[in-house]
């Protein structure tokens, strides 16, 4: 290892190597490779480290010693700080830490931010640095039918020129639905844990990997069986029982449960704080081998002692690395089919989620003969099971209105677990699709996931209708918009979709448009999400129909396990509050909003039913456990953007002194010509300090912490031993509200293409908006463009061009809301800047690139944007004009089309190279 190689370090969950007897370290020269390899995590060897002069070492030997000692120190740290179960004496820990400090002082290249020497107490965190894999970590090609699997099997036999009468040893394994992981061990010590990433570089998650109990910090077994260096590939996952336990804990703590074990494992493995990961009960199975080096002085010599996959698994078992118990050795295609059939019938019976069967040629020499494509080995394949289908009840069919007015029927299902997550709703696309499927409300229906991702209602189970005909009813698409009451109709004759024509003021459409303009694809206002958009445009959503379900003072209903809530009796004389007028009636007022405008906005919330029971904790003490079990049907209002009234905190003597110093500094600055406004600024999102609002009297309560943007709504009189004290009760914009206004200020200077997307022009998405903005240069030019002008831009089709021209034509109509929005935004400084020319090198000028499948480092849109930013054309289909096709996971027919046409197919790594250089 070179001395400038940066390593990231992590810790274990307390499982360190057992203390072994002296292995003869005294016979090796201190500082030699043999001496370093013979060191053990014992007190005696810690003393040896403390006495050793690191200045006598070479840089390479110092790096080896640092790696070994750092791993032990981090194991000690997690055992002490996370597990509260120290495994080393204080003297041994201190000696190892001093050794690291001396090494880093003598060899500065070893001193990096991830070193244990930079960690204060129990402060552990990850930065997920990108690290190159020692050897490439490839993904697998998928097949979805037995015919495709047989084609692959026959191609292997053919490419190896294997005699038909001779059995070909293969390994059959269940495909774990988890996250791929590369474990790097040097001299038997866990050095790093990396995610797959793009296969060439992955994220360093070593800190979190060390918390997984089944991953050993040190490889066990006889010394002659432990190599100098090895990459162990495998899968991190969560067992079903651990997943259910975690979700119960999430619900008890009032947090949302995870949708499936894979999501739970992914979220747990990417925690910034590894102490959280340590509580998540993650598991690991090894299933592959990367680089393996025994070293010249190894007892077995320099030859490769692992001849096949099964031998690697035997070694893993000796080392204490877990391997799946479901692996099978097979020698014929029929045995592969037997494995597929067995686990197809027993998918729900094993300890973890699975999504297929992996078949590998067992012999490593034959694997090398077969080689690999640009992204996957030819010696392995993943057979994916057909989409899992389950039955459930169709409770109802509702409709939702989208941002362009399209009205879509949505199936409301009795929640059912299918292919890794719980499904409770799925789109039915349009009324014609409902009729085509022949479904009735109340039917038992078949649900599956298309591609194991998108929920799909297949159709009814007809035999379940017998005797229940009177409980079923046909769905009829509404005549009027459920949100605004406008009459629905197709946009043009022959359309299957029906739309709400009330584009300007339909609350549902406006809400969806605000959500869209705040999204990452447009203005990227992160803290203006769905709930904030509803509060701005339709705060009376969920308003109760009558006072019978209005409970202004009930935020939750507590019940004992198994009990039902008591009936609710409204207080006599109680009336529903007056309906609120939305703050936004269209998008035009968005950038004129102030925090003061949002002070009185309230939204409706349902009181939860919370089950409370007592349990005994690990310390023997009783504690109450709360679990949300449903909604009560009772509604109350809560502030949407400001905090609830809260007593101000009294300042400590130290805080009062600091405030006095700050005020003195401001006064001094003012006497030198600076203004107070330059020093303190105005509250975020307000045109004037909120202190000018009625009821504000912060100056009257100098001993309390009353923020500059707060309003005192009342004064409570608190009786203490010294008498009656006046306590100001304040409200202020919430933290999310303050962040929202900050982000809106930044959005005023958004790129022109983002402004175009934010205008919600039908059919116009980010990639095409970029093309138009880049070609036209300014909003004024786009406003006056013709269809011919726009279609002259490479990549802009006639339908999109027509939509853009029609939208801007509407802005010129007197009283049209689109014109009002455009003028208001321009007055606020939005869209007045000309489009900036890309500062990136135009490496793809004149090139057409198609992206298919999912990439690790890019979303579908960001990949297209990366191509366009570099002067290329991001096409949606493969043709003879295509220059490159980027192949991601689960690539479909486009990959086959590219292969058929002989178009170069790129991995994600090659795509990154293409973006950077324009060549491969």
From Swiss-Prot:
Superkingdom, taxonomy of origin: Bacteria
Biased composition (Polar residues): 669-682
PROSITE patterns associated with the record: BRCT, DNA_LIGASE_N1, DNA_LIGASE_N2
EC supergroup of this enzyme: ligase
Cofactor: Mg(2+); Mn(2+)
Single annotated GO MF: DNA ligase (NAD+) activity
Chain ranges of the BRCT domain: 839-920
The protein's name in its UniProt record: DNA ligase
Organism: Bifidobacterium longum (strain NCC 2705)
Gene: ligA
